[in-house]
């Protein structure tokens, strides 16, 4: 995935990334809600139906709540969040109308608070595919509770906690 492989690689190598389709084809604009999910018009709406999962609605809810606090659109919040990500140099927007363009450009005036960024990070945290989850726990498996180079590790739950448990 981009989140699991490309972004970490780009950050490690000092490369900039330009995310494409940061509003997921309009899904993150606030246009689609749980209440209207069954009333989406055919045509353009057909291509977004598969993205309208409970997880996505959680992101939309968070974007809408933050947008209300900033008196702006969910799209502006989503774009401000993406643009503030480490390693992101620019974003590609896909506005079809002047109103959408103005909404997207208003993201340049948004300054998100730390707690808002953390909430969006948590709401949009991707499920990474193998081997990422395995690699994330490798440090703990290798060092089994020891501190190495000043970095502490946790003892995996499968390992014995004492000599009595070993034998």
Name the predicted role of every residue range.
Residues 12, 38-69, 84-88, 102-167:
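Terminal-tail/helix-coil boundary detector
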Residues 77:
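Glycine/threonine-rich phosphate-binding loop and adjacent beta-strand/alpha-helix elements that clamp
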Residues 58, 72, 96:
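Residue-level signal for the nucleotide or nucleotide-sugar donor/cofactor binding architecture
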Residues 80-81:
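Hydrophobic, secondary-structure "cap" segments at the distal end of domains
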Residues 2-39, 73:
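Aromatic-lined glycan-binding groove of carbohydrate-active enzymes
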Residues 27, 100-103:
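Phosphate- and divalent-cation-binding pockets in alpha/beta enzyme and binding domains
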Residues 24-25, 84, 97-98:
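Short, solvent-exposed loop/turn segments at secondary-structure junctions
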Residues 89-100:
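Glycine-rich phosphate-binding active-site loops on the catalytic face of alpha/beta enzymes
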């Amino acid at each position: 995935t981009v989140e699991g492989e490309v972004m970490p690689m780009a950050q490690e190598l000092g490369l900039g990334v330009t995310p494409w389709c940061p509003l997921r084809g309009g899904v993150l604009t606030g246009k689609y809600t749980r209440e209207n999910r069954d009333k989406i018009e055919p045509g353009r709406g057909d291509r977004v139906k598969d993205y309208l999962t409970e997880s996505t609605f959680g992101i939309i809810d968070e974007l809408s709540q933050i947008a209300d606090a900033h008196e702006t659109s969910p799209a502006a919040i989503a774009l401000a969040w993406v643009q503030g990500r480490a390693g992101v140099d620019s974003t590609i927007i896909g506005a079809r109308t002047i109103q959408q363009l103005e909404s997207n450009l208003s993201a340049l005036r948004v300054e998100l608070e730390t707690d808002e960024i953390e909430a969006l990070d948590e709401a949009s945290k991707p499920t990474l595919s193998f081997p990422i989850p395995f690699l994330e726990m490798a440090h703990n498996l290798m060092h089994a509770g020891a501190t190495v180079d000043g970095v502490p590790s946790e003892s995996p739950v499968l390992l014995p906690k004492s000599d009595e448990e070993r034998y």
